Design a protein with these regions (language model features):
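Short, membrane-exposed interhelical loops at transmembrane-helix boundaries
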Residues: 107-127
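Hydrophobic cores of alpha-helical transmembrane segments in multi-pass inner/ER membrane proteins
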Residues: 61-66, 135-147
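Membrane-interface capping segments at transmembrane-helix boundaries
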Residues: 147-163
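Membrane-interface helix-boundary motifs at transmembrane edges
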Residues: 69-77, 154-155
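Juxtamembrane non-transmembrane "cap" segments at the membrane-aqueous interface
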Residues: 27, 92-114
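Individual transmembrane alpha-helix segments
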Residues: 38-64, 128-135
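Long, glycine/tryptophan/cysteine-rich extracytoplasmic
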Residues: 9-50, 97, 117-118, 123
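Hydrophobic alpha-helical membrane-insertion segments
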Residues: 5-20, 76-99
């Protein structure tokens, strides 16, 4: 659970700080309606409009998990372990993972474009691989910091409880 939250926070952080070229910046700004989309085919525009919905869903999920993690700070190790194990595996065979995710999230098939299309030339697969690696590394760092802080508090609480029992 916490690792998923760390992944989402890392995603938004990398999204803000990633070194984009001008065309990529324009595309990201268009997703957030801060700029008009560049000339694209109807299929590319339909794909980008769906991507907008996924960005909104990711933002809602991030906020929801932040609130939930704040109210329920106990770890969910089974979810965390699954995410920690699956994340590097997805990076090992990124092309296949990328294709599978697109088949799941875009079942109507509007994610396959010619190699010379605007989207493919602006944000090629290598861009998403670098973005994903940066997101994963930052998520691991955030999770490590959270774990250290959480366990420091837990150990302190445990030792305090233990010493009060022993002093009785």
């Amino acid at each position: 659970m916490i690792f998923v939250l760390c992944l989402l926070i890392a995603f938004w952080t990398v999204l803000l700080l990633f070194p984009y070229n001008t065309a990529q910046q324009d595309l990201i700004l268009a997703i957030f309606h801060l700029r008009e989309y560049a000339p694209m085919t109807a299929a590319e525009l339909a794909h980008m409009h769906e991507v907008e919905y996924y960005f909104v869903a990711a933002l809602i999920l991030t906020i929801t998990l932040c609130v939930y993690a704040y109210k329920q700070p106990k770890p969910y190790w089974h979810v965390t372990l699954l995410c920690v194990l699956l994340s590097p595996l997805t990076l090992i065979n990124f092309h296949q993972t990328w294709d599978m995710l697109h088949k799941i999230f875009f079942p109507q098939g509007n994610y396959i474009f010619p190699y010379d299309s605007y989207l493919i030339t602006t944000v090629p697969l290598e861009f998403f691989l670098q973005f994903s690696v940066a997101t994963f590394i930052l998520a691991v760092i955030l999770y490590t910091v959270w774990t250290c802080v959480y366990y420091r508090q837990w150990v302190s609480s445990f030792l305090s409880s233990l010493s009060s029992r022993l002093s009785k």
